[in-house]
């Protein structure tokens, strides 16, 4: 089981994402220079579109329709996949991503350095939903449509990520944090799934013995 490449790949994604998330928070939220750079990036990007204060904009109206389309598309992919395990993995990824983002935003502190709004907005709950749907699309897309599905999923996710920055809903650090939460959740779920599958195979009876005792 320990030599399972699928398990190690998923575990590596989970670990790298977790470490990246922690480092990102410590830098862009936990330091004055990090807060300043993060806030200035948001201000400069939004200024290109004439946005000076947080505003609903077009994305405020398009957000829910885009999410509904995203959930419908994922449901179709899961139905076509016809795998109960994939459905369970998808549900776990979405729940862990959204729950993780909500808990982190509620618990993490934003030190007061006089830079931008004092309330913590790391990570972005809005982007976390799009990131979770993208992660699910990655694991359930059929090989024949994989390229098209991934282009659509990452494209919509990128548009949502850019929109919340341009409209001053979130700073770039908040957005990247949401993607890392989704990657960490997906990696953790896939790691558990790979470990469970390997353990099931090892315990499968073969000639009166489990596979672990062959020979």
Predicted stretch roles:
Residues 1-66, 105-114:
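N-terminal transmembrane-helix/juxtamembrane module of multi-pass inner/ER membrane proteins
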Residues 2-6, 76-89, 139-146:
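Membrane-interface helix-boundary motifs at transmembrane edges
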Residues 8-13, 85-93, 148-152, 174-177:
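Alpha-helical transmembrane segments of integral membrane proteins
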Residues 14, 18, 90-102, 179, ...:
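Alpha-helical transmembrane spans of integral membrane proteins, capturing the lipid-embedded, hydrophobic core
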Residues 59-82:
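Hydrophobic alpha-helical transmembrane segments
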Residues 74, 82, 95-103, 132, ...:
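Transmembrane alpha-helix boundary/anchor motif
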Residues 88-120:
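Hydrophobic alpha-helical transmembrane segments of integral membrane proteins
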Residues 114-215:
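Membrane-embedded catalytic cores of phosphoryl/pyrophosphoryl-handling enzymes
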């Amino acid at each position: 089981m320990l030599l399972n490449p699928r398990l190690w790949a998923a575990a590596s994604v989970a670990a790298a994402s977790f470490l990246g998330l922690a480092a990102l928070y410590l830098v862009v939220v936990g330091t004055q220079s990090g807060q300043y750079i993060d806030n200035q990036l948001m201000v400069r990007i939004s200024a290109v579109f004439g946005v000076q204060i947080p505003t609903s904009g077009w994305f405020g109206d398009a957000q829910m329709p885009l999410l509904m389309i995203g959930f419908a598309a994922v449901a179709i992919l899961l139905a076509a996949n016809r795998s109960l395990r994939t459905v369970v993995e998808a549900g776990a990824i979405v729940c862990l991503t959204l729950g993780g983002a909500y808990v982190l935003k509620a618990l993490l502190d934003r030190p007061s350095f006089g830079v931008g709004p004092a309330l913590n907005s790391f990570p972005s709950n809005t982007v976390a939903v799009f990131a979770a749907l993208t992660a699910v699309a990655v694991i359930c897309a059929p090989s024949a449509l994989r390229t098209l599905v991934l282009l659509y999923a990452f494209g919509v996710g990128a548009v949502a990520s850019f929109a919340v920055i341009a409209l001053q809903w979130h700073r770039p650090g908040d957005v990247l944090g949401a993607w890392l939460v989704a990657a960490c959740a997906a990696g953790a779920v896939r790691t558990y799934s790979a470990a469970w599958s390997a353990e099931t195979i090892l315990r499968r009876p073969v000639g009166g013995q489990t596979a672990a005792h062959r020979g």
